[in-house]
From Swiss-Prot:
Subcellular location, principal: virion
GO cellular component: virion component
Protein species of origin: Porcine hemagglutinating encephalomyelitis virus (strain IAF-404)
Compartmental location: Virion
The protein's name: Protein I
Keyword field: Virion
Gene that specifies this protein: N
Superkingdom to which the source organism belongs: Viruses
Stretches of the chain forming a coiled coil according to its record: none
Function as written in the Swiss-Prot or TrEMBL entry: Structural protein that is not essential for the viral replication either in tissue culture or in its natural host.
Length: 207
């Protein structure tokens, strides 16, 4: 090492000049892809690929990313009884890899594809829908009437009292229906028939 005192010669400056690493062909390493048997070069100590091999390596890297994505999707569908024949045809269309010109790969993302709605379409007419809306209360009322008749036959006073309170509350709700319809109008599908107030019916005498 040259002394720090005195003038510095040009030869001593060359000792501190950073050495430039020249390209050594022996550092060319071939990595094999075990899935497809592909060979693409990787240069140790270099940040970019060779110019004459850059485009070819870029395509191989693109295929490698796509193959890994397809394999992960097929592993998810394995054992579920799903037919994966169409998956291999549709996935390459939905995958894109963002690559820069210098060979650097960025994160890949799914392309924007038209989303097909899987919700069931409404195929029944409005008349059948109204019929279903009418049949649901009838079924509920028939079950309630059967339960009430059994309780009356058993003669439980507490059960008869609770049924009487329920009937009175139901009659009160029927009388309030017209006012509720004016305050909160409903859809035209159910508003075809004018709802009229139902007169209060005398409850059956308790035994």
């Amino acid at each position: 090492m040259a002394s720090l005192s005195g003038p510095i010669s040009p030869t001593s400056l060359e000792m501190f000049k950073p050495g430039v690493e020249e390209f050594n062909p022996s550092k060319l390493l071939l990595l094999s892809n075990h899935q497809e048997g592909l060979l693409y070069p990787t240069i140790l100590g270099s940040l970019e690929l060779l110019s004459f091999k850059k485009e070819r390596s870029l395509n191989l890297q693109r295929d490698k990313v796509c193959l890994l994505h397809q394999e992960s999707q097929l592993l998810k569908l394995r054992g579920t009884g799903t037919d994966t024949t169409d998956v291999l045809l549709k996935q390459p269309m939905a995958i894109s890899v963002n690559c820069c010109h210098d060979g650097t790969f960025t994160t890949w993302e799914q392309d924007r594809m038209p989303n097909t709605s899987t919700a069931p379409t409404l195929t029944e007419s409005s008349g059948s829908l109204v019929t279903r809306l009418i049949l649901i209360p009838r079924l509920t009322l028939s079950i309630g009437i059967q339960v009430a008749m059994r309780l009356f036959r058993l003669g439980f006073r507490l059960a008869r009292y609770s049924l009487k309170v329920t009937i009175l509350k139901a009659q009160e709700g029927l009388l309030l229906i017209p006012d509720l319809l004016r305050a909160h109008p409903i859809e035209p599908l159910v508003q075809d028939h004018v709802v009229e107030p139902i007169l209060a019916i005398e409850p059956p005498p308790l035994v």
